[in-house]
Amino acid sequence: MPSFDTVCEPNLPEVKNAVENTAKEIATRFDFKGTAAAVELKDKEITMIGDAEFQLVQVEDILRAKLTKRSVDVRFLDKGDVQKIGGDKVKQVIKVKSGIESEQAKKITRIIKDSKLKVQAAIQGDAVRITGAKRDDLQAAMALIKKDVPDMPLSFNNFRD
């Protein structure tokens, strides 16, 4: 029986490259000379540091541009609050989402079941497996998921025939 998995996983090497390119651009830009502006990636968390909140906005704009250039969906980013750290510096942590949360997985299975397609959806950890008798039904399920869940960067893998 044909099946596929619906997952939400970023291309982490490309995220790392985008963060490194952002750090290089910060180091060479004239408006960041002599400031504490920095960006770094540690364990699926991007930390941005700046002298003021407007600098964090500029660093985030650069980061988003670099991610987009490297074909990484910016919906993977989950911004945290701006925190004041020692002196007059501010910091913001951006988490890189990975995996489908349980309530999102339940939403996807509910969408599949309500669609009356001849497919079954099962939650398996941080992925949703869709199984059906025909390949056409699976393709219809893919189109339905992409249309009805626009707020998550979902991808489909592990196709079985």
Swiss-Prot record:
Belongs to the YajQ family. The lineage of its organism: Bacteria, Pseudomonadati, Pseudomonadota, Betaproteobacteria, Burkholderiales. Pfam families: DUF520. CDD domains: YajQ_like. This is Nucleotide-binding protein Vapar_3769. GO terms for cellular component: cytosol. The keyword Nucleotide-binding applies. Disulfide bonds: none annotated. GO terms for molecular function: nucleotide binding. Nucleotide-binding protein. The keyword Cell inner membrane does not apply. Transmembrane segments: none annotated. Keywords: Nucleotide-binding.
